[in-house]
Amino acid sequence: MSDSLHFTYAKPAMCVGGFSPERLKQTQDAGFSFVEVGFSELAAKTESQIDEYLAVLNQYSLTPVAANGFFPSTLGAFFDGSFDIGKTREYIARAFETTRKIHFESISFGSGFMRRVPDGYDRDRAKDFFVGLLTDEVVPMLEKYDARLNIEELQESETNFINTCREAADIARAVNHPRVGVLCDFYHMTKSGETAADVAGFAPYVGHVHLASPTSSRAVPLPGDGDDEAYRAFFKALAQSGYDRRFSIEGGVASGRDFAGTLKESYTYLTGLFAPYESEKV
């Protein structure tokens, strides 16, 4: 294996938005040190509430490094006539200020409900709006608070705009800023027909990765879940592309399974798959 084929962060983080203290303790016990939190969820809290939350994470030696859920549903949709740029601008500024104590290596911009394009709406116009919103309203906050935002592709059942990593990369390319990239979600990517063979086409823009099993109804990755070969090919393609950022598990635990045991099994499984590409910095 070439020395160049390594992951800078070869230990997965866990998405813990909405987790109780008990679940956070189980996350720690499973082996996790890093977590991904809910951005809009935290943005709705007071500063003292965020301090309390960070204290709980610290109690379990969990470091927040990423966030998902950039926009809350209360802001409405971009293209249905209800969009209020003033209200959105106010939210963005307040959200970054409220969460300023967390250094976000990645904030994912999914929000499929907001970006759905109505029938008959010009797609080029939608893209121009999206690029303008990121460039004019979001990038200044990313610079001010030393954060990165990654555009998440979502399968067609969740939205009809930006359904592939390639499309997300087109947006990131148009924004043309080092703090804006692509969140490559293995689950959505697979559901949208992209494979490891497609990674090279958008790899330069990938700033974060989400993992869940497409075969097992978006569950956390596990041995024997039917996706092992696809995981291995995906990780190899990322390593060959020079990917050097984090991975987060964004999957659930099937009903009837032991949560703590399943989480530990997933962590052990993924760290084993990462092992050929592991570097000293984790």
Model feature map: region roles:
Residues 43-45, 127-129, 159-163, 184-194, ...:
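Active-site glycine- and acidic-residue-rich loops that bind
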Residues 1-9, 13, 20-31, 89, ...:
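Histidine-acidic metal/acid-base catalytic patches
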Residues 18-20, 39-41, 70-73, 113-115, ...:
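Active-site-proximal loop/turn and secondary-structure-junction residues that shape catalytic pockets
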Residues 73-79, 115-121, 157-158, 191-192, ...:
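A short acidic, helix-capping loop that chelates divalent metal ions and anchors anionic groups
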Residues 3, 79-181, 261, 280-281:
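Active-site acidic/histidine proton-transfer and metal-coordination neighborhood
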Residues 36-57, 111, 118:
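Glycine-rich, proline-tolerant flexible connector loops at the mouths of alpha/beta enzymes
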Residues 26, 30-48, 68-76:
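N-terminal substrate-binding region of glycoside hydrolase catalytic domains
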